[in-house]
């Protein structure tokens, strides 16, 4: 646990939170600034800044928790859909640099930012495929 990380403190019970679920690796809490009713965060108890730092087995476990929580939220809230997302880096919208997964119930009449689909750049795709060989 990092002493100066608010999410380390929230995940490890240093501060009181509205906890929806907890196990030995994760705590799921309600977002303090929710996008919708039922918006929660899956937070690992160990500190990892982003997806590039967390071990593969632990991120796999995090998404198992996310699925379990999303399933329960869908039933309890009656939402029509769910976004599961995780931001990495400031330009990607990460504001707290302790990895966390957002689970955001979506409602038919709800508002939420969506991206505008663009055009596929075949040359860029081919370049990314070629440059990724040996990395994956």
Please give the residue ranges for each predicted region.
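HIT superfamily nucleotide-processing domains
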Residues: 1-136
């Amino acid at each position: 646990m990092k002493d100066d990380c608010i999410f380390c403190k929230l995940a490890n019970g240093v501060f009181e939170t509205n906890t929806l679920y907890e196990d030995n690796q994760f705590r799921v809490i309600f977002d303090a600034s929710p996008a919708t009713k039922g918006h929660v965060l899956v937070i690992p108890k160990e500190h990892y800044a982003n997806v590039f730092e967390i071990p593969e087995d632990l991120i796999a476990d995090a998404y198992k928790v996310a699925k379990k929580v999303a399933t329960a939220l869908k039933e309890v809230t009656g939402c029509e859909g769910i976004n599961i997302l995780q931001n990495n880096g400031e330009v990607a919208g990460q504001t707290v640099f302790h990895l966390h997964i957002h689970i955001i119930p979506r409602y038919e009449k709800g508002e939420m930012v969506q991206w505008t689909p663009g055009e596929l750049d075949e040359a860029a795709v081919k370049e990314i495929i070629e440059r990724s060989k040996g990395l994956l």
